[in-house]
From Swiss-Prot:
HAMAP family reported for this sequence: HemeA_synth_type2
Matches recorded under Pfam families: COX15-CtaA (PF02628)
Record flagged with keyword Metal-binding: yes
GO BP, sorted A to Z: heme A biosynthetic process
Role description: Catalyzes the conversion of heme O to heme A by two successive hydroxylations of the methyl group at C8. The first hydroxylation forms heme I, the second hydroxylation results in an unstable dihydroxymethyl group, which spontaneously dehydrates, resulting in the formyl group of heme A.
Name of this protein: Heme A synthase
Membrane topology: Multi-pass membrane protein
Cofactor(s) it depends on: heme b
Annotated Gene Ontology cellular component terms: plasma membrane
Subunit structure: Interacts with CtaB.
Keywords carried by this UniProt record: Cell membrane, Heme biosynthesis, Iron, Membrane, Metal-binding, Oxidoreductase, Transmembrane, Transmembrane helix
EC number: 1.17.99.9
Length: 342
């Protein structure tokens, strides 16, 4: 089994998933995500080719609540601009699928990947198909009376991208990290902290999607306090109380802030306790950069470029945590490191 070509392919696929996350963020922030009102997996590959085609697409958009509420009277040129943003988003998604599927078939036929790896990557393929449906499911939520996509569906869309990224990148790390003859000695607490951090990062990414979907980044644009308060007064005005966790903009932002500080604290502790393990510094640097990006995004009222960088870097932070766990599994003999199967 030749690992290098497979590893390069997995790395490319992982990068393309991150690219898709960035393009998706730009599409959302540009308010272009609802400009294409139909989902045509095959025939939708081509954009409108004639003036008549463009007119038909614009007429479909004019029937949507978003047009009537937010973009009433936009010109054809303005419509083309938002349409092409969403079109590129969908086109790159299709391209990502091809970049994964075609080499995958080739590597299987040439027997360059083991049966275990084939199964794992086939699972990634299934999640990719599910992701396509989830994307349209999300868009549909904004084509109803309220021209705003569901933040729950937005979180699902992002979470599925994270699962695909995890499956691809972890397999890439597995190929790249070579076990050393002298095994590392790590405590059970190290594994516990590493796993906890990974889980918290996933939860944090979900709440990041909630912040984005609820426009919660447009309130309390101060740091470290929330308009002069450690705990704002309007955290629990929704009933029942538990609903505030998911639908109260102030509460969602508060949780997102708190999780960021908790993750930073745990990563610092992990770094101090494992100063001799180099990958832990990648994770520390990643979490610091991510928090800085988040604070700048908040203080500057969500500038598009910084907000996209913040969204993209959440995957890099997740990847650094995943890499650390994979490194531990490869470089230690402790049975507790079998959190991820080889």
């Amino acid at each position: 089994m030749e690992a290098k070509p497979v590893a390069i392919w997995l790395f490319l696929c992982s990068v393309m998933v991150i690219l898709m996350v960035g393009i998706g963020g730009f599409t959302r922030l540009s308010k272009a995500g609802l400009s294409i009102t139909e989902w045509k997996p095959i025939t939708g590959t081509l954009p409108p080719l004639s003036e008549q085609d463009w007119l038909q697409e614009k007429l479909k958009y004019e029937a949507t609540p978003e047009y009537k509420a937010l973009n009433y009277g936009i010109s054809m040129e303005e419509f083309r601009a938002i349409y092409l943003i969403e079109y590129i988003h969908r086109l790159v998604a299709r391209l990502t699928g091809l970049v994964f599927v075609l080499p995958f078939i080739y590597f299987i036929l040439r027997r360059k990947i083991s049966k275990k790896v084939v199964i794992k990557l086939f699972v990634a393929l299934l999640f990719g198909a599910l992701q396509a449906f989830a994307g349209w499911y999300m868009v549909k939520s904004g084509l109803v009376a309220k021209p705003h996509v569901s933040h729950y569906r937005l979180a699902l869309h992002l979470l599925l991208a994270l699962v695909i990224f995890a499956l691809l990148s972890y397999q890439f790390f597995d190929y790249q990290i070579r076990p050393q003859q002298t095994k590392l000695k790590v405590s059970g607490n190290t594994i516990y902290y590493a796993r906890m951090i990974l889980v918290l990062i996933v939860i944090q990414i979900i709440f990041g999607a909630f912040v984005a979907g609820l426009n919660a980044g447009l309130i309390y644009n101060t740091f470290p306090l929330m308009d002069g308060q450690i705990v704002p007064e309007d955290l629990f005005f929704l009933q029942p109380i538990w609903l505030n966790i998911f639908e109260n903009r102030a509460t969602v932002q508060f949780i997102h802030r708190a999780l960021a500080l908790l993750i930073l604290t745990l990563v610092v502790i992990l770094t101090v306790k494992n100063a001799s393990i180099k990958p832990v510094y990648i994770m520390l640097l990643s979490v610091v950069i991510q928090i800085i990006l988040g604070v700048i995004t908040l203080l500057l009222h969500i500038p598009i470029a910084i907000a996209i960088a913040h969204q993209v870097f959440s995957f890099i932070l997740f990847g650094s945590s995943l890499y650390f766990l994979c490194y531990l599994r490869k470089q230690t003999t402790s049975p507790i490191c079998t959190f991820f199967p080889s």
